[in-house]
Amino acid sequence: MIEAENLSKHYGPKVAVDGISFRVEPGTVTGFLGPNGAGKSTTMRMIMGLDAPTSGRVTVNGKPYAKHAAPLHEVGALLEAKAVHTGRSARNHLRALAATHGMPSKRVDEVIEMTGLSAVANKRVGGFSLGMGQRLGIAAAMLGDPRTLILDEPVNGLDPEGVKWVRTLGRYLAAEGRTVFLSSHLMSEMAITADQLIVIGRGKIITSGPVQSVIDATAGTSVTVRTPRASELAELLVSDGVSISASEPGLLAVRGVESSVIGETAARHGIALHELIPVRASLEEAYMTLTAGEVEYTSTASGATTQDGPLA
């Protein structure tokens, strides 16, 4: 379990993390989402004791990371895949980590096989591709068979097979009762991997909760209706909490009304429906809505802009 209470981090006048509180429960995969610069990596570094909080506290399995006698058995983390000695082989890198906790070479061999690095285990890390570097970082995180796993952008650089492998691994570890906390910019992948979400922007938590609850509360669902009597049907459906838009003649997007109600209303008034399709919003749509005002850099059709104006 990971617990943060009023956690803040300031770098001079810049507030990177601003008084956030959250809990990451065992037995779940919790996704940590937010734009670049939102405070995700800083938060993960504070969890791992690499950055000291300006105020507040964070514990892993009941203690600050530094207080654990054998931290690799409690927490495994991938924060920066390139944080390795490039002249060492993958096997020797893992052996060096294992030696700090008295772990046998057998465990090194196990995580090498688990992460698909057997063919390159004796090659220097400096020659690894980005994807192989990510796999090595995950191998290091799994080395101590930890109760909690923290992964910052674990699928970065992985091919589709590797992305699927990370998803399967995360789900498997959570099913074993472990705590899995991961960040990613791949919304489609997060939607099918995570149970819970924490969304952060400009150092503050924007929202949190089960994946589908976050989507429904933010973007919800709509119903696509195609009918030759669109204007008439729209007038019949108008009420408080209902929004109706028309992207083209005869086509309506309706929010706030179930498809069954639309169908029954049309039937009562003899209105023919050519399409009646419930459309569930995606996590990407919900995320873009939630973070629309939280990004440091945005782009427009006419050119790139920042908070201070157009880029030269």
Describe each region flagged by the PLM:
Residues 2-4, 9-201, 207:
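ABC transporter nucleotide-binding domains
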Residues 57, 222, 272-275:
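Residues at or immediately flanking beta-strands
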Residues 65-66, 102, 205, 228-230, ...:
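Short, surface-exposed acidic/glycine-rich loop or hinge patches that mediate macromolecular interfaces
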Residues 68, 214, 286, 290:
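Residues that scaffold the ATP/ADP-binding catalytic core of kinase and kinase-like folds
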Residues 101, 218, 241, 280, ...:
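Conserved NTP-handling cores and scaffolds of large molecular machines
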Residues 166-257:
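ABC transporter nucleotide-binding domain
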Residues 255-312:
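C-terminal coupling/interaction segments
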